[in-house]
């Protein structure tokens, strides 16, 4: 299976040095196509994707921001894709927030995320202390091992696809007074051609 590496070019070359080494280890022996620019994010439907984002000292990568904007602008850009994420930071901040916004954007663009989809490398790699101890290696070695394990799982992942999935909506609200039910009333008609929907009200302890 071919893997698509989406690896936004860093603002400064030094910001990508560590992540480059991690990727060489994680992707060794694999067939990989690499995309570095937002304008290259075309014809990606039903692909297996690995996002690898190098953040600078301030948690910013301008090419990544351009990619993020495109993902938010084109809701079917990654239709049918499966993805994992590696976010590498120069400091102790911003990796988690960057990963959160990226996960939301790729999911909204039609992409399913792997279970435990994130490998996060903070500046000190202190978040790998436990893994390093368990593996009998240093922090950098644990980081590389986590990235490799993510790619292994990503390549082996298959999401079951059903022609008409069942969707059950449980609620304990009144159709007349609930904002949540009003929202569901707007969402449900948009799903009925793709899902078999059933709604059950749980009120006053009854089913």
What residue spans do the PLM features occupy?
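FMN-binding flavodoxin-like domain, especially the glycine-rich phosphate-binding loop
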Residues: 1-198
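Conserved acidic residues
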Residues: 201
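Cysteine-cluster motifs in flexible loop/terminal segments that predominantly coordinate metals
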Residues: 204-207
